[in-house]
């Protein structure tokens, strides 16, 4: 099958080439009257026998124009005007003058589509039959297309002319049958069908019934050469730049874009704006330019003296928030705050240690699960402890900041506890954060109603460490996390220290959770101010 198809294609190529070089002559008909198709074929044979004036050029082209000039055939004139003037149809009268009959805009392109397909428009059949001059040739109409759109001189515009043959279609044949049978004579259905068959035989081209594949390939090749630039993709591309499409784009450019295309319109305008900007970024070659900076003389005199006070800037030192002057302790000061609570079967006990070392005015803090055997380890100062222990201590700052940390951690424990909480305090050293006696433990607590003041939001919960130091079922955080919450980069204004009752213990009811933001000194100061 593949081999037979290749042979048919080769046969079609040979037939087309031989017909272009040496076309066979047709037999003369007995009637002596030739149709327009026979005239065109005879003209084709005649032109093929002539030698071309220029080599590599053919003379057997533009046959319809040559036939019209030889026999002065009547034509339908179609004028294509530039811009928005549209197009018009002209018919020639008996006196030889052309008269314009129809003028349409380019938006109404139905007639142009028929002309492009070389078909006779059915809507023009009645108009052409009423013409003073017969323009039908074997059922076909010769149309002359005059294109004024390429002319540059608008005062006396010239045009480019070409001729096309409009062939009848089944629609035009139906119109002819209807116009012929619309007289007073009674036509039966058989008479109408017979009339239609005779019209088809008179207007149709010769039909080849040879079942050879080469005939189909030859017809396909001839049709391809004639409609090579008349395909649907090519029409779609050319239609974008047609006059009707340009007019529609111009009308839509003044209208606001739809909401779905606002982004596309913005990008298009920005692209046009950037395209209009031109920058001269040419870099001259080395040696063609003069460096004026190097050529300018540099006369700088060395000053004999410099006024330092004139150019120096003095930065004021930051004053401490403590109302009390900085005290350098003579001994180590350590305060331990132990918080105890019982929830269900769990016993929780944590310890907050505030330490001030010898020769250091700053206070340090440490939060850890309280154990009796770790009492000796907690005595070690941050400056003398190991690397692991030193990482657990965090810098608090002044004495006021240390008191604020104690208050905040106490509020945190009472807000997070689901059971009564007991706090005990013990201090050692020359001075203590509280006014109690040295080394004597105290117990105190604050009512839960006071803790709710100033809290406007309900933040995520923070859990307390268990007594064993490990988190139980993910409900408690570690001591390092709590210490990180208590750090404050900028100390807030000092707040009044709440009074703690000695050796008193108050059970707390269930309270709500507190966020890490409540641990900062700033949030604590807001609650005390409120």
Swiss-Prot record:
Residues 419-530 are annotated as: Disordered. InterPro entries: Spt20, Spt20-like_SEP. One of its GO terms (molecular function) is transcription coregulator activity. The modification Phosphoserine is found at residues 296, 515, 520. It comes from the Eukaryota. The keyword Protein transport does not apply. The modification Phosphothreonine is found at residue 490. Keywords: Developmental protein, Gastrulation, Phosphoprotein. It holds the Pfam family Spt20_SEP. Belongs to the SPT20 family. This is Transcription factor SPT20 homolog. The lineage of its organism: Eukaryota, Metazoa, Chordata, Craniata, Vertebrata. The gene is Supt20h.
